[in-house]
UniProtKB/Swiss-Prot annotation:
Induction and repression of expression: By auxin.
Subunit and partners: Interacts with ARAC1/ROP3, PLT1 and PLT2.
Name of protein: Rop guanine nucleotide exchange factor 7
InterPro entries, sorted: PRONE_dom, RopGEF
Sequence segments annotated as region (Disordered): 1-48, 463-491
Key words, A-Z: Cell membrane, Cytoplasm, Guanine-nucleotide releasing factor, Membrane
Domain notes: The PRONE (plant-specific Rop nucleotide exchanger) domain is responsible for the GEF activity.
Compartment list: Cytoplasm; Cell membrane
Species per Swiss-Prot/TrEMBL record: Arabidopsis thaliana (Mouse-ear cress)
UniProt KW Transferase keyword: no
Top-level taxonomy: Eukaryota, Viridiplantae, Streptophyta, Embryophyta, Tracheophyta
Amino acid sequence: MDGSSENLPEVEEKGRESSCCSSETTRQEEEEQSPSCTEDFTASPVSSRWSVKNIDGEKKKIRSDSRVSEVEMMKERFSKLLLGEDMSGSGNGVCTALAISNAITNLCATLFGQLWRLEPLPTEKKEMWRREMEWLLCVSDHIVEMTPTWQTFPDGTKLEIMTCRPRSDLYVNLPALRKLDNMLLEILDSFEETEFWYVDQGIMAHESAADGSSSFRKSFQRQEDKWWLPVPRVSPGGLQENSRKQLQHKRDCTNQILKAAMAINSITLADMEIPESYLESLPRKGRSCLGDLIYRYISSDQFSPECLLDCLDLSSEHQAIEIANRVESSIYLWHKRTNSKPATNTKTSWEMVKELMVDADKLELMADRAESLLLSLKQRFPGLPQTALDMSKIQYNKDIGKSILESYSRVLESLAFNIVARIDDLLFVDDLTRHSSDQIPTTLGNNGNDAPKSIAVPVSNYTTPSYSPSKQELRSSITVPPSPSRFKIPHSSSVKRVLTAYVTKNEPRLKNLPLERSSRSSSSERLSLEKCMKESLNVSNLDPGI
């Protein structure tokens, strides 16, 4: 009995072991039959945790790489500014003011160029523009001026002390320029979902030949001068009325931005000192600057700037800027002679004695007339490039604050004008599409002379080859000045002969030159002068040989 009782627990243990083994084998078989479920159940949380960690690590790596690249880019920019664009380090570079001006100009040319299309600026370019402009403008935060203020002590006594505050011109104009900058970028961002698109001129010519729409190509002759610009296209029915109103509103806003940028730029240029090198390069006489014909008209009693401009050949931009340079140089030459005092110890020649006989009031009168002529010329051609004096001021300017304001306003002026020009192109195409059966003028927009104009800013030999952004004619939202081709008077020899004879007849001698400062002639004198010009035009139309 004892042996049998001892063997019973052993048998039970073996049975339990066999049952455990069988259960384990069945469990293993079940696991083998459904391996995917167990693998998914056990591996999914681990793999998800690893993927999240990898994504976070990649993001951190990208951020660190971008920060390193930004730091390296900032080091490169400021190294060029400190070296004055002279990479040899020998100290032959340009001054800091000109280096900052060149940097802002080149940055705008790199990111915006000619602004071929009305479309949002890519995010990378927008971030690069804001980041690098912030780097270049940060120096203005440390340009201050000392002003006296009164400080009150606890015992009631007052003491006058000098405190620092931002310089007045930067404090007023720089925030305004930043606001204009943001507004221009917002206007570009608004052209995201549009009813128009752009087609390259080669593709457009192929499509026109295929569908027979040669009239559209023929009417769009203005684009032939700028073959690189794509041509805007709209649907056959044209733009919707709401879209056209929004487009016109954007044009008006951009035009106001353009006027504000031009005003800041002109004020800044006027505040810059005239370089001595420019004054030394002027000739000794105003007649040498203006030429005999313009000088005789200015020194005459019958002087009218508008009539004088009508008889001059202003058919091209080159001729207009040449006359502007000559008139501007004569203005400063006469002012220089008025303010200068002749030396009494040196022996003068008879020619210098005759020049000294001319009264200072008469020289100022001539300078005032030349200024009125230059003003009329700029009003007739508001998009003229910078004159030789303006470029000389930019080149020899030492004031960093004025250099920042001038270059920043100039690039915003260029960007705003390009936006206005592209909107005018689009509005013209829309009008052409809506009224394809009517006779449409073959000039685009409100101004027929829309060729790009670059501002030639003098740079050093060490500057990276680049160009200033285009600066084209301003088109006012209220009144648009006509292009040279529209108001150009036929420059026959009879016009100049009659006008010269009329002026010569009434031309006074220098000693009889009036002392009054008025630069405008009476209405009767101007009417008589215009009458002579009209008669000469009628004669030239009847007989071209006269």
